[in-house]
Amino acid sequence: MLRQFIISRVGRRLQLPMITQSRLASDLDKTEYTTPGEIVDYDDPPHLPVPEYPVRPDEPLETRKQRLLYQSRKRGMLENDLLLSTFVAKHLKDFNAEQTAEYDQLINGVSNDWDIFYWATDTKPTPPQFDTEIMRLLKEHVKNHEKVQRIRQPDL
């Protein structure tokens, strides 16, 4: 009798977490997820100082391209990492000094990476100072007419 009592108590303890898990799983099945209809974007407060990116006029072209390759891969948000790293892998080797400087200004002159993403995807209008030949190339790259899967960064 005591043995049956102990087995039943231990059995209930072991079954309790499983019942809880199945109850939670069934609750999750009923949950619906929706994406917001519009982008919520607030202006930066005026009291936040944004540091100016230092201009490097004496930097050799190859060194600048290597730096831009690294900076395009390490943006801090996956969306831009994928878009910019694939863009650089495709176009950077063919850029001349002026185009390289434009790309440098684009990715380092903007204080918010979401701005680059919204401009490249045509979610927001591009400001005139950043609406350059390089931005137009980036927008074409983002449209992905070739239907290339961009689920990871290209190899170095």
UniProtKB/Swiss-Prot annotation:
Role summary: Plays an essential role in the assembly of succinate dehydrogenase (SDH), an enzyme complex (also referred to as respiratory complex II) that is a component of both the tricarboxylic acid (TCA) cycle and the mitochondrial electron transport chain, and which couples the oxidation of succinate to fumarate with the reduction of ubiquinone (coenzyme Q) to ubiquinol. Required for flavinylation (covalent attachment of FAD) of the flavoprotein subunit of the SDH catalytic dimer.
Keyword terms: Chaperone, Mitochondrion, Transit peptide
Pfam family for this entry, one: Sdh5
SUPFAM superfamilies associated with the record: YgfY-like
Family, as annotated: Belongs to the SDHAF2 family.
Identification of the protein by name: Succinate dehydrogenase assembly factor 2-B, mitochondrial
GO biological process terms, semicolon-separated: mitochondrial electron transport, succinate to ubiquinone; mitochondrial respiratory chain complex II assembly; protein-FAD linkage; tricarboxylic acid cycle
Localization: Mitochondrion matrix
InterPro entries: SDH, SDH_sf, SDHAF2
Species, as recorded: Drosophila sechellia (Fruit fly)
Chain segments annotated as transmembrane: none
Residues of the transit peptide: 1-24
Quaternary assembly: Interacts with the flavoprotein subunit within the SDH catalytic dimer.
Any one GO cellular component localisation term in the record: mitochondrion
Taxonomy, superkingdom: Eukaryota
